[in-house]
Amino acid sequence: NFHGMPYQLLDPKLSEKLQKFPKKEFIFQADTLNTWIGESVDAPNTSVLLDNSHGAGVFSNNWKTFNKPYGYAGGLNIDTLPVAIDEWRTQNLGMKWIDMETGVRNNGEFSTAMVTEILEYLTTEGYIYSGKKRN
């Protein structure tokens, strides 16, 4: 994750170099950088993470789309996720993944119960395919 990497440090041949590692995905976080960074790196194994809270875990509904795989972070949890999903559907954003690090913690500790609750919700909403036939 190239979070907070000053654009001056980016190698002009970065796209070429990243393609040498096709089994790895490189994520460019677009919170502290200009959003162009994730889009300008032209390698198939790159994606963009948009976190308007700059890693502070604060929910925002200021969504943006990108011309490559992308995901969202920032205050997502079991309470805010349905609101976010409704917005993504309404705006037809088609995001690919979410980052919920703080949203699955209870008093700073990772909670498998919270993860399970979120996965069950996402499966019910059709965002995760469980292997079972859907009606």
Where are these regions (language model features)?
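Conserved, mostly hydrophobic/aromatic
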Residues: 84
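Conserved anion-binding
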Residues: 1-71, 77-80
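A generic structural motif
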Residues: 27-33, 51-53, 98-105, 132-135
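Structural alpha-beta junctions
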Residues: 16-27, 43-45, 68, 90-96, ...
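Glycine-rich phosphate-binding active-site loops on the catalytic face of alpha/beta enzymes
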Residues: 1-6, 52-59, 72-73, 77-78, ...
